[in-house]
Amino acid sequence: MTVVSAGAGAGRPRPTRLLADRVVEVVCRSLAAGGARAEVEVVELHRLAADLAQHAAHGRASLDLREAVAAVAAADGLVVATPVLAASPGELFDSFFAVLGDRVLAGMPVLLALHTGPHRPAPGLAHVLRGRLTGLRADPVPTVVVAGPPDRQSTSDGDAGELDARIGRAAAELAAAMRPHRH
């Protein structure tokens, strides 16, 4: 089974990418526990920023953008990790999903992971983002992983229980949704 990790984070260090990697690792373990072998492909949206802008302005997709879309289309499941900036996802998130459209995401099991700044996002934001994915005919799992600086601090202190539980629950939901999903 193929899991694509699409991360919309930028900057160094890349906390959104670290969150995505952590989630994908648990998804792979969940799949393995069910007897499935997972292959992972990573799509870093910050590397496609110029390609996404060109597509928005001229309607032309570069080779890199077409390859990213093809990777998502061929996936059995998708982990989407995006930073939350000023109570909304990053622009790369919106741009990439506009390119994908509903044909590519139809029926695709998706796990949404949000990396927040120092403040937690508005309570309804996860619902809004899940709604956007549903509007593209994707099949988002019920649990949304939300992590921020306090979670990174507790991880370094060795007390990551709550975040680990959310990741484990969401990963199990994605693995279960991926098993019957076939192209």
Go through each PLM region and give its residues.
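Mobile beta-alpha loop/short-helix "lid" or hinge segments that flank ligand
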Residues: E41-L52, T134-S154
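A short helix->loop->beta-strand "cap" motif at the edges of active sites that frequently abuts
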Residues: A36-R37, L105-P109, A138
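Short, glycine-/small-residue-rich phosphate/pyrophosphate-handling segment
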Residues: V110-P149, G161-A165
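Glycine-rich phosphate/pyrophosphate-binding loop and the adjoining helix
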Residues: D139-H183
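P-loop/Walker A phosphate-binding loop and immediately adjacent motor/lid segment at beta-alpha junctions
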Residues: V23, V27, S95-L111, G117
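Hydrophobic alpha-helical membrane-association signature
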Residues: L19-V23, L125, A170
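N-terminal beta1-alpha1-beta2 submodule of the flavodoxin-like/Rossmannoid cofactor-binding fold
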Residues: M1-V80, V84-D94, A98
